[in-house]
Amino acid sequence: MKVAIVFDSAGTLVKIMRVIKDLKKNKFICNSQTVDIVDKKKGRALVIIKEDPLKVVDKENPEKLISDLLKEVEIGISYCNPPINREGIFKDRKTKVKELQEPLNILKRYEVETGYGSALIIDTYAGEVEYTIATAGCLFKEVKETIKQLKDLGVKVFIASGDRKGFIKRLAEITGVDERYIMAEAHQELKRDLIRNLKKEGYFTIMVGDGANDVPAMIESDLAVVTLQNGNVSRRALETADIKIYNIKEIVDICKKVINGEIKGRMQIKECS
């Protein structure tokens, strides 16, 4: 049997450090996923800066408008609560770059493996930056060995993530995942389409994630797995998953059972539960 597994990155392979600033309250938020914040309001978009924030955010004039910065750098929408107004991404005329620098400066105090990311949550209809975000992370200690064992079993391993390309390329380097099998800046439809295409190629597909943006791919997959290792899981992902795991290494035994015919897919899991 041909088996392909698609991993999300943040919270799944990487112990993520995420600093989110609520600009209206002027406070930092703990234990929240950015996609869950986006889901709370129509018209919100999670906008990522595709370039290294240490080069394009950290060194920028703090008093510069964020909307002007966004016009100068490469950006992407990794998640949204449609419908959105794309022009509204550039309409905020009061929020300054220092609001992006503040969460980044907090994370710069830590030693990280994956590099840094900067993002914003924007109300695209109000034309207002509501949250600024910085991310960084370190691999869960079991990840390298887990991926090695999966490859030894003949499982094709993919990483599909909304994170910027530099972040995901670095993750592929340190985990041993073939760079041909990574998908950066992947919104939820791209993850779903990856699963769909792998199924067309004859693979039994497993989607592993913990976020709301993993849910369409989970639904499309033959088997959906949610990982609880990071400790902060989207309710939608939890409700959609067929199997819950508490450590990423558990996925090896799941794949063995799939290969041996002990797990034949979603229907069998539901019949046994």
Swiss-Prot record:
InterPro entries: HAD-like_sf, HAD_sf
GO MF annotation: an example: ATP binding
Gene3D superfamilies: HAD superfamily/HAD-like
Keyword Metal-binding: yes
One Pfam assignment: Hydrolase
Top-tier EC class: hydrolase
Highest taxon above the source species: Archaea
Cofactor: Mg(2+)
Temperature-activity note from the record: Optimum temperature is 50 degrees Celsius.
EC number: 3.6.3.-
Catalytic residues (UniProt): D8 (4-aspartylphosphate intermediate)
This protein's UniProt keywords: ATP-binding, Hydrolase, Magnesium, Metal-binding, Nucleotide-binding, Phosphoprotein
Activity modulation: Inhibited by orthovanadate.
The family this protein is said to belong to: Belongs to the cation transport ATPase (P-type) (TC 3.A.3) family. Type IB subfamily.
The protein's role, per its UniProt record: Most probably acts as a phosphatase in the cytosol.
Annotated protein name in UniProt: Soluble P-type ATPase-like phosphatase
The species this protein was found in: Methanocaldococcus jannaschii (strain ATCC 43067 / DSM 2661 / JAL-1 / JCM 10045 / NBRC 100440) (Methanococcus jannaschii)
